[in-house]
Amino acid sequence: MSLTDTPNASRLHIALFGRRNSGKSSLINALTGQDTALVSDTPGTTTDLVSKAMEIQGIGPCLFIDTPGFDDEGELGELRISRTLKAIEKTDIALLLCGDTTFSHEKEMLALLKEKNIPVIPVLNKIDIRENSDSLATYIEEECKIRPLLISAKEKTGIEQIRQAILEKLPSDFGQQSITGELVTENDLVLLVMPQDIQAPKGRLILPQVQTIRELLDKKCLVVTCTTDKFPATLQALARPPKLIITDSQVFKTIYEQKPKGSELTSFSVLFAGYKGDIHYYVESAAAIERLTESSRVLIAEACTHAPLSDDIGRVKLPHLLRKRIGENLQIDMVAGTDFPQDLTPYSLVIHCGACMFNRKYVLSRIERVREQHIPMTNYGVAIAFLNGILDQIKY
């Protein structure tokens, strides 16, 4: 991804679901205008999720996701289907390609998508080789209670209808979230304290920093940045105290102890807790840390899949803070990327990263799973602020 690209996590996620050989790959190629997905007459050609980023006029940046057929068979087929079901968790809008035999699989998928409150656009593909498209569409409408769009991905017929349907199904709140919310307005002075993150390549900033700076510039704020060691010197160089200080959560305590009394304090992780998830639930759940004992079990979830580093916040620093508070025998499990247990009942607490690499839908899906099992869930920044005794002083 270049510096001018929209991160995939900020794009509208549009997933294509259907049986094997229903034309999902052909449709995604027609929609994107590129040979993004491999097309074959052999059922089951798509064996993993295939994604393609593009812009749709009137909608903006999108990410199309091609999924394996939900009627796959055998042990390997079950694995492919599980990946298809995982894709639902990150889907903002679903394109459901209907077959021409029974509709049991389609109805099951439709029910699952509706249960997750995901807008669905049913599609009847291959009308260029069907003689009964209209009657089949009527039958599908009777079975699924929603009329499909008639298209031919091969001939690119009806593609514009799909784009229009996506626009009409666009969630009203999509893209309306703000990283900094109402914390700052035009002309406010904002100081960003950014330790040199060894996970970021030389000469680069990590994604939350880039996105936050861009939003502050869009709000016409006055933006100043510094590293932790230059924080005191930066304050002295400023004509007035910052309205807001945004820091890396790892140095929360250091910055809190040195900040001007009138400056408000938050962190990138805390801001992303609200931007991607449910900040109020995270703050409420942080109190569960007090109830932990050495026999408790905690799950730490990291969106990134980078190789562990010596001072990794999720694998080293946060566990150290927790065990220092609770005891060395506290059991802590770590998952990364798309790995996330279905059964969370063994855990007394889930702590998630800021999820800059996940879209909001995916994070909210995880929160929903956790809440359904009555497990408290918080966030790196919120947890660190709580462990440092300053959560009530942090703004979000």
Mark where each language-model region is.
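Conserved G1/Walker A P-loop phosphate-binding module
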Residues: M1-E78, S82, K86-E89
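Conserved hydrophobic helix-helix packing surfaces used for dimerization/oligomerization
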Residues: I14, V190, S296-V298
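Short, flexible loop segments at the rims of nucleotide/cofactor-binding pockets, characterized by
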Residues: D41, F70-L76, C98-T101, K169-P171, ...
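G-domain G4 guanine-recognition motif of GTPases
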Residues: T67, L97-T101, I118-D134, L149-G158, ...
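Conserved C-terminal guanine-recognition region of P-loop GTPase G domains, centered on the G4
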Residues: K52-G60, E75-P148, S178-E182, L205-C221, ...
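C-terminal effector/interaction modules appended to NTPase cores
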Residues: M1-S2, R19-S25, G203-Y396
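Canonical P-loop GTPase G-domain recognition
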Residues: E115-I121, K126-E182, L189-L191, K220-D229, ...
